[in-house]
């Protein structure tokens, strides 16, 4: 596999010296492997620190002039980043990687070690921040000091199947909060929790079924239900639950109580440490239970605060996203609970479509990408207006879309929002869209990188899912990869001149 990777055309191109032309000032995008190290290829220019935004750029998002960023990226890291991003955009390569990771090759210690070593030296090092919370915190520190980009610490486990695993994962999340607390507040923005890691998926499905049935049948009551905000609207997909579910057994109720305790322990630790907590979203089979747990926790830990501790995630590619957001915000305002929201487009389009089709129902996802963009921008505008009126709302705009960034910049100007007050920030995945991250940063916004960590074997499901989720987006990032290749060519020319 490694040999075939090295023989691909995109790696050969930087060495075709006959095709090289002067590229002038390097207008390149960013590698993610950013370290506080200055390279010297040819003449070195004196420039201000990367994390001091240029005031002249606060009225626009510059996605072309990345010379400052690349000045701190070693050529070896830039080369690896280009290779990894190119490979992640090749569908058959993603399929091959998935097959290898689930094949018998992983049963033999020799081949397993070789595969894990290859993964660690390529995809893992590019998309992950380290093998434990302390290593990830060090990576956050080095990235911030080199670039001014903050970090979101994410323990990269996908799910747990039993109580013991849920407890282990909870302790990992608590250690993550401790690691974040050890950093200067300027270096990090939040930690992220996946409810699927602290509550068995089977129980989340059961709770979601019961919540859907309660919404369908107002006379159907759930004795175990805590106070929460609305998790459905009239346009929400309810086809997952066509018959009345059996009530939770006594054992399931005890498991649910234990899951509530885990998330509340995590929230309490965040509250004590003044570390915001972002709750990740899942597919619509599980999302009602996740929304319920996020909102019930927010009511407990956000009330009477100037800023939220608990943030829930809204997926704008869902048709009902806007309605559910408005309902939740209205209820939060009524209860005087400052609420935080992370706004994403969504990542489960294929699986949502397959499930809906198998049930003879319409997909809960918007028909077109344009409708998803419109929904995202409408939700973004709504949340920015809420955050600007002193209500205490917090907003994390997780997007790789430059047009949404430009709209946010215009809206912030219209509303007179202080872009650096921490109530509104942008986020992109670690290892992706660094050009956008730097453009937004230089425009004056707080910008963070979503930085998962964990042992290589633990992170593999995350890496595979990330590859599948972002295959289309990676393919559309050809311009970024082209600019990275241009920077490699420029350095080679400068090195031989």
Residue map of PLM features:
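Positively charged, amphipathic and often flexible ligand-engagement surfaces
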Residues: 2-497
């Amino acid at each position: 596999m490694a040999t075939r990777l090295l023989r691909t055309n995109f790696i050969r191109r930087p060495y075709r010296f006959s095709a090289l032309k002067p590229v002038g000032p390097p207008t390149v995008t960013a590698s993610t492997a950013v370290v506080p190290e200055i390279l010297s290829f040819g003449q070195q220019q004196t420039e201000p620190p990367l994390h001091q935004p240029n005031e002249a750029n606060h009225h626009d998002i510059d996605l072309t002039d990345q010379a400052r960023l690349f000045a701190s990226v070693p050529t070896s890291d830039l080369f690896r980043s280009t290779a990894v991003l190119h490979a992640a955009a090749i569908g058959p390569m993603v399929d091959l990687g998935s097959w290898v990771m689930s094949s018998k090759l992983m049963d033999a210690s020799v081949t397993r070690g070789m595969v894990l070593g290859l993964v660690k030296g390529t995809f893992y090092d590019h998309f992950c921040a380290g093998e434990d919370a302390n290593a990830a915190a060090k990576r956050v520190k080095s990235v911030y000091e080199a670039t001014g980009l903050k970090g979101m610490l994410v323990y990269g486990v996908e799910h747990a199947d039993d109580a013991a695993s849920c407890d282990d994962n909870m302790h990992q999340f608590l250690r993550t909060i401790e690691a974040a607390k050890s950093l200067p507040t300027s270096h990090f923005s939040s930690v992220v929790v996946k409810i699927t890691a602290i509550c068995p998926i089977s129980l989340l499905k059961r709770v979601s079924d019961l919540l859907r049935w309660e919404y369908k049948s107002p006379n159907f009551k759930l004795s175990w239900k805590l106070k929460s905000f609305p998790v459905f609207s009239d346009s929400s997909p309810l086809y997952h639950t066509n018959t009345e579910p059996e009530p939770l057994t006594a054992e399931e109720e005890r498991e649910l109580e234990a899951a509530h305790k885990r998330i509340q322990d995590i929230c309490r630790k965040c509250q004590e440490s003044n570390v915001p907590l972002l709750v990740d979203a899942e597919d619509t089979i599980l999302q009602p239970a996740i929304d319920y747990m996020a909102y019930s926790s927010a009511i407990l830990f956000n009330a009477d605060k100037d800023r939220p501790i608990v943030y829930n995630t809204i997926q704008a590619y869902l048709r009902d996203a806007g309605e559910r957001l408005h309902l939740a915000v209205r209820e939060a305002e009524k209860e005087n609970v400052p609420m935080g929201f992370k706004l994403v487009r969504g990542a489960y389009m294929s699986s949502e479509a397959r499930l809906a089709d198998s049930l003879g129902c319409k997909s809960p996802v918007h028909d077109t990408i344009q409708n998803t963009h419109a929904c995202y921008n409408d939700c973004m505008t709504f949340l920015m207006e809420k955050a600007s009126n002193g209500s205490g709302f917090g907003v994390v705009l997780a997007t790789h879309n430059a047009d949404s960034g430009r709209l946010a910049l215009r809206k912030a100007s219209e509303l007179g929002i202080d872009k650096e007050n921490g109530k509104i920030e942008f986020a992109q995945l670690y290892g992706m869209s660094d050009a956008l991250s730097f453009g937004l940063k230089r425009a004056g916004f707080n910008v963070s990188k979503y930085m998962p960590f964990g042992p290589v074997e633990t992170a593999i499901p995350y890496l595979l899912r990330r590859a599948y989720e972002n295959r289309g987006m990676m393919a559309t990032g050809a311009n970024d990869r082209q600019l990275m290749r241009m920077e490699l060519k420029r350095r080679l020319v400068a090195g031989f001149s």
